[in-house]
Amino acid sequence: MSDLKKGLYIISTPIGNLEDITFRAINILKSVDFIICENPKHSLKLLNKFGIKKKLYSLHDYNEKLLIKRIEKSQNTSIVALICDAGSPLISDPGFKLVQNYIDKDLFITSIPGPTSLVPALQLSGCPMDSFAFFGFPPKSNKSIKLLVNKIVNIGLTSL
């Protein structure tokens, strides 16, 4: 896949079984210049399984702006992958500022679909799937949890 465009590839990764990754995702990961991930130690399990050796940059909420500055000079000339520890990046994960940075600079960006926990959770729930709301991880404080529960109860949609 050496004909990849320079830009950002948001790549879904397996949730539990490493073999759930797509062939396309593996080929792109083999072709990128570097990979932005949450936890390099965790990501290496996947990458090593498929013989992928790339420079890894760790991304967290606290270092996202710094990471953007760090890669800024190479954004126009690099093929970059964004992965998370499990599933689809950006769903309850850091990275939206990075994506917004690429959008603001009118740089190429695409999503490589794959494993996600949302659809299986909906499928196995037995609830209607035509309309639903996703709330991510629950808050930590009891007060915030109560507010969220009230919001979910009153929304009238299948809620995750």
Predicted feature locations:
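Short glycine-cluster motifs
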Residues: 76-135
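Beta-strand/loop-alpha-helix module characteristic of Rossmann-like adenine-cofactor folds
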Residues: 2-6, 119-160
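Conserved helicase motor
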Residues: 57-65, 137-142
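Short amphipathic alpha-helix with an adjacent loop that forms part of the alpha/beta core around
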Residues: 68-76, 153
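Glycine-rich, flexible N-terminal cofactor/catalytic loop recognition
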Residues: 1-62
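Short active-site oxyanion
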Residues: 29-35, 107-110, 158-159
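Alpha-helical segments flanking ligand/cofactor-binding loops in enzyme cores
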Residues: 26-27, 72-73, 96-100, 150
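Glycine-rich loop at the start of a catalytic domain that most often binds anionic cofactors/ligands
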Residues: 48-53, 72, 95-96
